[in-house]
Structure formats: structure tokens, C-alpha cells
């Protein structure tokens, strides 16, 4: 039976459960449940703390897991990323008191508070910077005001929380994170087919969230220009219409770009442009 780790709480929990449900797997009915057996798919799900999931997978106790890329990197567990899931995006950056221009080199000899000490130490070592890293499990932003640290390294969203504590982010991102499906680095043939099947199902759901199917009628004389705008994954589908001067075109397009793509098609003469949701896809 395939053994899969799923976040039991936090921002990754519900989207992960939703994707697995859309992929045809059983959901837990009580948030207190720590395991759920799905006999129809021969899978057992374990609901664990997101920060611990990479450790369980890396040890070989579990076959697959869903966690954050930053959490997997911080764990230093021997895991590899199988698939990016398209939710839970964040950046991990340094921040320090506002009022001056900061650079990573300014951290030399200073105290840095973070919930991700391994990530920070690796980054500092790569830059040749010596600093004191202080591990905190939460509310890292307040550490500077309380005199515990001179700077922090933390997940940064809009920057609003940093601003409330008179901090400003600086330097490049230490880690651009999102939810990922992971497996043990060097995982062998055991349960390989089952791992592949779950990954394919999940990838199909993720793809359906990121792409749309676009259908439109196109004058033949601008078909080359139209297919440059909508090349599809491999190639667009082109079918004749009753009017021989026109063809029907169907192609997958990125959801985030659909409005600009429709604008371009309309500008070159395409008609009846229709965007449709897709739920699943297999490659």
C-alpha cells in the first residue's frame, strides 16, 4: 500500500486535500484523524506537521509527501521534488530595520533571527558571511524590536507585516517556495508504479487549474499568425468549417494569459472565441 504524507494544518492543508480529492482519493471526514485508508486506490494518507513531512519521506517510512519547498530544504532530508503544485507560493528573504540601504554583506557579525536556520546558514556560507543565527519558531518580526536580533530572515508576502514592525526586506530571495510533491532521493522500484500513478493524477489536476481550452473560428489567411498566438502544448487542433475560407482551432492556453491571447486573436480577425475550463489532463 502506498503511504503518503499530507499537511495536517496550516495554509497548505486544505489546498492539498482538495487536489487529492479532485484526483480521486478519499478525504478525511474529521480533522482530528491522523490517518485515512483509501482501499479503492490502495493508499494510506498520514496527516502530519508540514515541517516534519520531508523527514518522514526522506527516511523511507513514507513514499510521497506534500509540503513546502522551503520546509523540505530546511529539513535537510534526502528528498527530491517530484512535482510543483501551484499553491502556497512565498519568498524567503532577509529583513532589517528601515532607514538605511541594506545588503546581505551588512549582516556580517550581526544576529539573524529565523525559523529556517539551515537555509540561512547555507546562504551565509555561500556568501562567505559570518553571523550568528538565532532560531525562533514564530513571530520572528518582533525579535528586532525586543533586542534579540539585528535582522531576520523570514517568509515575505506583501511586506505589510514587515512594515508594521519597521522592517524592510533586502537582497535576493533565499528560496522561492510553493507546495511540492516530494519523494525520497534515490527511491527505488518499490511502489514506483503507484508513486507514478498518484503523481500523474495530481499533475492532471494541477494542469487543469493552470490551463484553459480555447476554441475559435479563424480565417484561413491568418491561420499561421493565429497558431503562433495559440501553439498549444504540442500543436493546435485545426478542423475545416462549412465555409472553406474558415477553420476551427482548438488549443490549450495558460489561464493567466487567456485575456491577452483573446485580445490578440480578435485583433487578427478570429471569431467565436470561447475559453473553457478543463478539470483533468494526462500526458
UniProtKB/Swiss-Prot annotation:
Name of the protein described by the UniProt record: ATP phosphoribosyltransferase
Annotated function: Catalyzes the condensation of ATP and 5-phosphoribose 1-diphosphate to form N'-(5'-phosphoribosyl)-ATP (PR-ATP). Has a crucial role in the pathway because the rate of histidine biosynthesis seems to be controlled primarily by regulation of HisG enzymatic activity.
Compartments where found: Cytoplasm
Keyword Signal listed: no
Enzyme class (EC, first level): transferase
Main location: cytoplasm
GO molecular function, one term: magnesium ion binding
Keyword Cell cycle: no
Family from the record: Belongs to the ATP phosphoribosyltransferase family. Long subfamily.
Listed GO biological process terms: L-histidine biosynthetic process
Activity regulation summary: Feedback inhibited by histidine.
Keyword list, A-Z: Amino-acid biosynthesis, ATP-binding, Cytoplasm, Glycosyltransferase, Histidine biosynthesis, Magnesium, Metal-binding, Nucleotide-binding, Transferase
Subunit organization: Equilibrium between an active dimeric form, an inactive hexameric form and higher aggregates. Interconversion between the various forms is largely reversible and is influenced by the natural substrates and inhibitors of the enzyme.
Cited CDD domains: PBP2_HisGL1
Natural source organism: Mycobacterium sp. (strain KMS)
Lineage top rank: taxon: Bacteria
Catalytic activity field: 1-(5-phospho-beta-D-ribosyl)-ATP + diphosphate = 5-phospho-alpha-D-ribose 1-diphosphate + ATP
Assigned EC number: 2.4.2.17
Amino acid at each position: 500500500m502506498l503511504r503518503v504524507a499530507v499537511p495536517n494544518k496550516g495554509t497548505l492543508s486544505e489546498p492539498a486535500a482538495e487536489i487529492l480529492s479532485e484526483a480521486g482519493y478519499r478525504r478525511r471526514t474529521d480533522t482530528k484523524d491522523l490517518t485515512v485508508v483509501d482501499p479503492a486506490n490502495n493508499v494510506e494518507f498520514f496527516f502530519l506537521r508540514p515541517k516534519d513531512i520531508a523527514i518522514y519521506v526522506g527516511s523511507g517510512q513514507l513514499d510521497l509527501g506534500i509540503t513546502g519547498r522551503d520546509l523540505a530544504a530546511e529539513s535537510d532530508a534526502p528528498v527530491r521534488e517530484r512535482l510543483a503544485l501551484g499553491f502556497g507560493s512565498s519568498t524567503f528573504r532577509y529583513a532589517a530595520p528601515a532607514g538605511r540601504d541594506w545588503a546581505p554583506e551588512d549582516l556580517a557579525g550581526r544576529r539573524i533571527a529565523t525559523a529556517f536556520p539551515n537555509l540561512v546558514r547555507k546562504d551565509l556560507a555561500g556568501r562567505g558571511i559570518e553571523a550568528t543565527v538565532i532560531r525562533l519558531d514564530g513571530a520572528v518580526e518582533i525579535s528586532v524590536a525586543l533586542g534579540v536580533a539585528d535582522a531576520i530572515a523570514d517568509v515575505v508576502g506583501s511586506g505589510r507585516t514587515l512594515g508594521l514592525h519597521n522592517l524592510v526586506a533586502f537582497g535576493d530571495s533565499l528560496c522561492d517556495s510553493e507546495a511540492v510533491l516530494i519523494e525520497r532521493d534515490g527511491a527505488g522500484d518499490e511502489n514506483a508504479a503507484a508513486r507514478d500513478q498518484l503523481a500523474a493524477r495530481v499533475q492532471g489536476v494541477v494542469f487543469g487549474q493552470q490551463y484553459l481550452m480555447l476554441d475559435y473560428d479563424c480565417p484561413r489567411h491568418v491561420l499561421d499568425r493565429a497558431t503562433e498566438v495559440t501553439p498549444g502544448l504540442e500543436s493546435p487542433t485545426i478542423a475545416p468549417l462549412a465555409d472553406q475560407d474558415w477553420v476551427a482551432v482548438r488549443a490549450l492556453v495558460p489561464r493567466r494569459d487567456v485575456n491577452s491571447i483573446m485580445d490578440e486573436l480578435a485583433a487578427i480577425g478570429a471569431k467565436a472565441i470561447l475559453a473553457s475550463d478543463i478539470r483533468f489532463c494526462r500526458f
